[in-house]
Amino acid sequence: MTLTIKIGTLNDSDQSAVHNGTENGSDFRKITPTEEEICDDVVLLWKEEPGTEDATIQHLYDRITERNQSWKLSASRFRKILNEHHLYDTDLETVSLYKDKIHFPKALDSDAKVEVKFIDDEHGRGLFAKRDFSKGQIILKENKPIVYIPPLDKLFLISNGKACARCGKALYDLTQHKIMVHYLDCEVCKAIWCSEKCKKAHASLHELLYHSWRSNRIDILHAGNWKRFVNYCEKYCFTAAFSVGLIYGSMLLDTTGEVKEQWQKLASISQRERIKLRDASGIGSTFSLLNGTTVHTEEESDNGTKKGVEKNIDDETVWEKCYELFCGAFPKASEEIDFEKFLTMIGTFNINQYNGQVYHWISFINHDCEPNAYIEQVEEHEELRLHARKPIKKGEQIRITYVNPLHGVRLRRRELRVNWGFLCQCDRCQNELSTFERVPNLEKKNADANLGVEKIDSNDSSEDGSKKSTGNRKSSMREAQPDLKEILKNGKEFELDIPETVDTQGNVRKTSVRFDSNVSVAVDER
C-alpha cells in the first residue's frame, strides 16, 4: 500500500473553467440576476469587505461581477438598480424616512436608577440616568422579556421534545430521571421544559395554545388553528407574526393586565410603512431578516407533475393569509384587532425587539454610534444587563448602538434608515461623512453607460492632496486592521487584531491564523 500526499483546493476556489464560460468543454449559460439578488450581494460584500463600502461605483461593479461570473449584468443596469434602491446615494439626507410616522405613547416610567423622559416629537422618549455611573458599572437588569419568544427555527425540535418548550435550549444533557422527578414534561404532548423555572413561566400558555380543549378555552383559542398559524409563520420565516401571536395569547391569560400595559407603552409603526424602505430581501439585506422580511416563495407544480419551482409572493398576500390564520386561532381577535392593527403590532415588535425579545426598559433606549452603554445577555438570552461603557453623569441620556459599530458610516446609516426609520446625526457620523467627496446627484443622472466614475488607485495622490481614494477612509475602530483581501491572496500566516487571552500561568497570548486555499490530503493508492 502506498500513501501519497496530494494538494487539493478548498471551497471551489479553482473554478476557472466554469467562471470563464465553459464547463466540461460546453458553453456555460449566463443568467440575468434579479434586482433583489444584486442588492443582496452588494450589501453582503460590504459586510464581508467593509473597505468596499467607500469604493467608487465602477470598482463596486467590478467586484460584484468578479464574485458572480455567471451573471449577465451591464454596468448601466447595475448603477440604475443601486440608485433606485438607494444603495449608492452620496446624499442619504434626500431619501425617505418613516420616523415621523412612528407613534410614541406619552407613558413614562422610572425606578431608583433610571427614568424615561419625553424628549420631543422627533426623538420620542429616552432613558436617563438618575445618578452617576462609573465605567463598567451595571445600570440596570431586566430579568425577563415582556413575553419570552422561542426561536422560530427551533419549533421542530421543541415539538419533538428535543428542545425546551419555552426557551428553545437543547435538552441533550437533561436525563429522563430529572424529567420525571421534576415533572418537566407535558402530560399530553412531547413538549419538555429545561427547568422548573421555564415550566412555571410557560406551562399555562402552552396549555392554552396546544391543549385548549382540556381547559374548555376553545372560545378564546382554537389549538388546531394555532398550529396552522405557526406552520405558516415557519414556512415564510415570519418571526414577527409568530411573536405577535404569542404576545396576544399571553395577554388573554394575564389576569393582572401587565403584559398588555407594557405592550401599549411601546413605540408603534405599521409594517406596511417599514416595508416601503426595504432595499433588499435576502442574506445580504440591510433590512434585518429577524424583522420578518425574507423573500416569500412557495412551491408551484407544473401540470401537476413537476414540483419545486418557486414563485415569489408579495408581502400583502402573506400578511393577509397570516391575519386570516391569526383570527382563526383566536376566534375573538377580529373584534378588537383588524388587519391594519395586526400590521401595526408586527411593526411594533420589529422596532422594539432586541435579539428576538421585547424588554420593557431596553425598548426606551435610543441609538448612538459611540454609545455610553452596552448590553450583556445572560441566562440563555433571557436576562439583560445594561452596563456603562463610559462614565455617565446624573441626568445624562443613556444610549446603546443598534448596529455594528465596525461598519462604515454609509452602511450604519442605511441599516438605521431601513430598520428604524431614521438617519443618525451623531458626532461620529458627521465626522465620517465630512471625509467623503460628495458626488452631486446631477452628475449621477448624467453619467454615461460606463458609469462616468473614474476608478482611483488607492496609492495615487496629487501634490495638493485633492485627489484621494475614498477607500482610504476607515473608522477609528478598524483602521489598524490588515488588508485581508491581499493577505488571503498570498496565503500567508498573519496575526489578527483580536482580544488578547491570558492563560492559567498569567501569560498573555494571541491567536495566529493561517488562511490558504489549499489543503493536504493523504490518499491511499492500492
Swiss-Prot record:
Domain SET per the UniProt entry, residue ranges: 112-403
Pfam family, one: SET
InterPro entries per record: SET_dom, SET_dom_sf
Residue ranges with Basic and acidic residues bias: 476-492
Chief location bin: nucleus
Positions of the UniProt region annotated as Disordered: 450-492
Top EC category: transferase
GO biological process, one term: methylation
Gene Ontology cellular component list: chromatin; cytoplasm; nucleus
SUPFAM superfamilies tied to this protein: SET domain
Family recorded in the similarity comment: Belongs to the class V-like SAM-binding methyltransferase superfamily. Histone-lysine methyltransferase family. SET5 subfamily.
Stated role: Histone methyltransferase that monomethylates 'Lys-5', 'Lys-8' and 'Lys-12' of histone H4 (H4K5me1, H4K8me1 and H4K12me1, respectively), thereby controlling gene expression and remodeling chromatin structures. Functions together with the chromatin-modifying complexes COMPASS and NuA4 to regulate cell growth and stress responses. (Microbial infection) Acts as a virus host factor involved in the replication of positive-strand RNA viruses like the MBV.
Stated name of the protein: Histone-lysine N-methyltransferase SET5
Gene source species: Saccharomyces cerevisiae (strain ATCC 204508 / S288c)
